[in-house]
Amino acid sequence: MAELSTPSPASPAPLDGGRGDELEKFTLRGARQILQLLQDLITHRGLITAHTGGGHSFMTAVLKVDEERGRVVLDPSPDPQANRRALAAPRLTCVTQLDGIRIQFPLVGLGEGQDKGRPALFAPLPAEMLRLQRREFYRLQVPLAHELSCLLKAEDLARKPVEVSARVIDIGAGGVAVVVPTGAAEFVIGGTLPACRLALPDGEPIELDLEVRNLNRQTQRNGTEQLRVGLRFAALPRAADTRIQRYIFKTERALNAKARGGL
């Protein structure tokens, strides 16, 4: 298998399918457009979060686009159980980012086999792909070197108060995604975590309320499992939005300069 970039757990959870009308204009259905976008994912060695349902996901990548056979070749998970879940799922929802643009597409009819003598997953080419860049959906993948964190005030499995220091993996105008060890706390979709503390590099932590929007267990490429928690900003203090946008802007500018060789 070709060398891949470092896995990023920042890929967001799938967008709500109930927002179809709102997302329709961002959906690609042309065969040429879909083939080109898949090829771009190969060229940029983009890591994909593949959601199998039931809150489970694993990291994968597009290895090849077989236009003649009308199929896409994916890298399997090192975890056999994750592969079994994927093969049994009626639908695989793939989510990634490419040059700051969110990409999401469904795969059905997943199968397994060999590609050039190595294990691989196969699926028919997707019928559509979502290509989205909008302020409310955009998420900055936080560089590992920044060590952005958020102190979550939640409850453990015994319903006792617990504080969990979570690593922030992506951040946007509307919320953050964090990763925590599985079993660190009891999170409920729709529940509110009050008085959490988001630490940004430019000052004191921001105290804010967070609403749990999605939960996904992720199997990393080394086989370990962690819980990804998607959180919406339920109540931001005054000027906090400006600080968050400033952090995103400065980080994007630094990353772009580095990519151009300016740093």
Swiss-Prot record:
Q: Which organism is it from?
A: Thauera aminoaromatica
Q: How does it assemble?
A: Monomer. Interacts with the flagellar basal bodies.
Q: Please state where this protein is localized.
A: Bacterial flagellum basal body
The record's InterPro entries line, in alphabetical order, gives: PilZ_domain (IPR009875), Split_barrel_FMN-bd (IPR012349), T3SS_YcgR (IPR023787), T3SS_YcgR_PilZN (IPR009926)
Where would I find the PilZ domain in this sequence? Answer: 133-250
Annotated function:
Acts as a flagellar brake, regulating swimming and swarming in a bis-(3'-5') cyclic diguanylic acid (c-di-GMP)-dependent manner. Binds 1 c-di-GMP dimer per subunit. Increasing levels of c-di-GMP lead to decreased motility.
Q: What is this protein called?
A: Flagellar brake protein YcgR
Q: Does the keyword Aminoacyl-tRNA synthetase apply?
A: no
Indicate yes or no for the key word Nucleotide-binding: yes
Q: Which Pfam families match?
A: PilZ, PilZN
Q: Which Gene3D superfamilies match?
A: Electron Transport, Fmn-binding Protein, Chain A, predicted glycosyltransferase like domains
Q: Which family does it belong to?
A: Belongs to the YcgR family.
Report the record's Gene Ontology biological process terms. Answer: bacterial-type flagellum-dependent cell motility; regulation of bacterial-type flagellum-dependent cell motility by regulation of motor speed
Query: Annotated region Disordered: where?
Result: 1-21
Gene Ontology MF, one = cyclic-di-GMP binding
Q: Main localization of the protein?
A: other
Q: Which UniProt keywords apply?
A: Bacterial flagellum, c-di-GMP, Nucleotide-binding
